[in-house]
Amino acid sequence: MTSQLHKKGEAWSARFSEPMSELVKRYTSSVFFDKRLALVDIAGSLAHANMLAAQKIISADDLAAIERGMAQIKGEIERGEFEWQLDLEDVHLNIEARLTALIGDAGKRLHTGRSRNDQVATDIRLWLRGEIDRIGGLLNDLRGALIDLAEQNADTIMPGFTHLQVAQPVTFGHHLLAYVEMFTRDAERMRDCRTRVNRLPLGAAALAGTSYPIDRHAVAKTLGFDGICANSLDAVSDRDFAIEFTAASALVMTHVSRFSEELVLWMSPRVGFIDIADRFCTGSSIMPQKKNPDVPELARGKTGRVNGHLMALLTLMKGQPLAYNKDNQEDKEPLFDTVDTVADTLRIFAEMVAGITVKPDAMRAAALQGFSTATDLADYLVKRGLPFRDAHEAVAHAVKICDDRGIDLADLTLDEMKQELPNVAHLIGDDVFGYLTLEGSVASRNHPGGTAPDQVRAAVKAARAALGK
C-alpha cells in the first residue's frame, strides 16, 4: 500500500475494476470551492485526534505527529503554498493526503472512527458558526450607523407614505429607526439560528455511529459546541441549519432591499431628500450629468440572488432519503455565496449610511404637500366631541375644496374653514392651526413608538443601549 493518497480513487480503489473517468472526476470534485473549509477542517481533525489519543485509540506519538503535520499544513495554506489537487476531490482528502505524505502511517490513523460524512457536517457547522458571528457584528455596525443618523435627524420632518402617497408627517429619525428595528430582529434571528448550528455531528461516522469507544462530548467541548447531535442519521444527512441561516439571510437582504428602494427614490432629483457620497455612486458612459446610486440598486438585485440560494437549498433537501447522499455536495456554493453577499452588503451599507447627506428643506417642502395633516384636523374635531367617522367625512370634504383651489388646509383662514365646514363650524377655534402645522402634527404623536422628536430621542437611547448588550 502506498504511503499517500495520490488520487481520489485510492481511498476506495480496491473495490473497483477500472479507474474513474476524468470527466467524472471533474464533475464530482468540490475542492476548488470547499477548500475555504480548510482551517476548520484542520481544527476538527485536531480535536478528533486528541480525543482518539485520550481514548487510547491512537498513540501519543501518533497524536504528536498529527499535530506537527497539521501545523505545517496550516502554515502552507495560510501562505498560499498548499497544492490543491483535483484528483483528490475535496478539502478533506487533500489535507489527509498531505498529512500522510508528511508523517506517514500516523496520518492514516487520523480517520479512525470518522467518515467524511460527519467530517464535512462538522466543518460546515464550525465555519458557519464563525460567519454568523461575523454577520452579527456587521448588522450591529449598520444598526449603529442608522442610529447615529436617526439621532441627527430627530427633528427633521419628512412626509410619511402609504401606497407611495403622502400620508402623515413623520420625522426622518423615526423613519430610520424603523430599519433599526428590522435589523435588530435580523440579528436576533442570527443568534437564534446559531444555537442550532452549534451542535457537533462528529462521531456519527458514515450514518450509524462507530464501534470505537469515542468521547463525542469531549470533542464538542474542545471545539466550543453546545452539545452533540443526538441522532447519527440526522447528524450526517440534514442541512436544515444551513437552510435556516439562508432564510434568515434572505430576510436581512429583504430589509436591505426595502431600504435600497427608498434610498434610490430619495436620491432621485424629483425627490431630492438625500445625497449619497460620490464614492458609493457611478456615472454614465454617455450622459455626463449622471450620478447613479449603483450600490443600493445592486443590493436590490443581490437580494434575488440570496432568495434563489434559499430555494436551491430547500429543493436540494426535499427529495433525499436518509442518510447522506451526494446531493449534499451542492449545499456549499449557495451557502458560501450567501455569506459573501450578505457580509459584503452589510459592510458597504454601514459605510454608505454614515456618508448620507440629508436635505431637510426638501423633506419639509414635500411634507407640506398632499394634505399630510388632514388626520390631525379630524383628530381635532374628535377631541371636541365629533364621532371620528363624521370628522373623517368633514375633513375629506375640506380636502377636496382645498385641492380644487390648489391650497393646503393650513392656508384657509378661520372664517373660510368655518364656511366650508358649516356642520362643524361651532367646534373650530383659533387653536386649530396649531394642529395643522408639521411640527404640531409630529409632536402630538408623543407616545412610545410614535414619531414625536422626544420619542425619537428616547428610542435612539434605547436602541443604542440594546446595541451595547
UniProtKB/Swiss-Prot annotation:
Q: In which pathway does it act?
A: Amino-acid biosynthesis; L-arginine biosynthesis; L-arginine from L-ornithine and carbamoyl phosphate: step 3/3
Q: Does the keyword Lyase apply?
A: yes
Q: Which reaction does it catalyse?
A: 2-(N(omega)-L-arginino)succinate = fumarate + L-arginine
Q: Which domain of life is it from?
A: Bacteria
Q: Where in the cell is it found?
A: Cytoplasm
Q: What GO terms in the biological process aspect are recorded for it? A: arginine biosynthetic process via ornithine; L-arginine biosynthetic process
* InterPro entries tied to this protein: Arg_succ_lyase_C (IPR029419), Argininosuccinate_lyase (IPR009049), Fumarase/histidase_N (IPR024083), Fumarate_lyase_CS (IPR020557), Fumarate_lyase_fam (IPR000362), Fumarate_lyase_N (IPR022761), L-Aspartase-like (IPR008948)
Keywords carried by this UniProt record:
Amino-acid biosynthesis, Arginine biosynthesis, Cytoplasm, Lyase
Q: Which GO terms describe its molecular function?
A: argininosuccinate lyase activity
Which CDD domains does the protein's record reference? Argininosuccinate_lyase (cd01359)
- Which protein family is it in? Belongs to the lyase 1 family. Argininosuccinate lyase subfamily.
Q: What is this protein called?
A: Argininosuccinate lyase
Species of origin reads Burkholderia cenocepacia (strain ATCC BAA-245 / DSM 16553 / LMG 16656 / NCTC 13227 / J2315 / CF5610)
Upper taxonomic lineage: Bacteria, Pseudomonadati, Pseudomonadota, Betaproteobacteria, Burkholderiales
